[in-house]
């Protein structure tokens, strides 16, 4: 689609950021420090690039279509241990998705009624296995336009 074509042009071959089908996927390493939900500076910069394009795309969506940008957080399958902030990967993935949504609303001016934050923990992997590479692929934030 034109939307994903524009995203590819802006982001080029940025490491840790890719487009797969109808989803825009950030590696968690680009956005967050390990086991943290606060956006890193690099993550803020990448989100700002994407939101600039999202605004243009949103303006092109016909008025009768009630859309939302889904922000989905995913983790690897390594259990969280001894974290004062998160009891498990469900909580970490939800907190990361919410951190992205709040940044988009509070810092970038996205309308809050057009965003949703969802956490899936380790239960929707894109790579199978326990290798470092598989786990890295599964630690991600996905953005997807969908109808409400």
Task: Label every PLM stretch briefly.
Residues 1, 31-54, 58, 67-148:
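Periplasmic OmpA-like peptidoglycan-binding domain that tethers envelope proteins to the cell wall
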Residues 1-20, 25, 38:
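Extracellular/lumenal/periplasmic "stalk" regions immediately C-terminal to a signal peptide or transmembrane helix
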Residues 16, 21-30, 62-66, 77:
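Short, charged, surface-exposed interaction patches
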Residues 7-18, 59-68, 104:
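Phosphate-binding glycine-rich loops and adjacent basic patches that engage nucleotide phosphates
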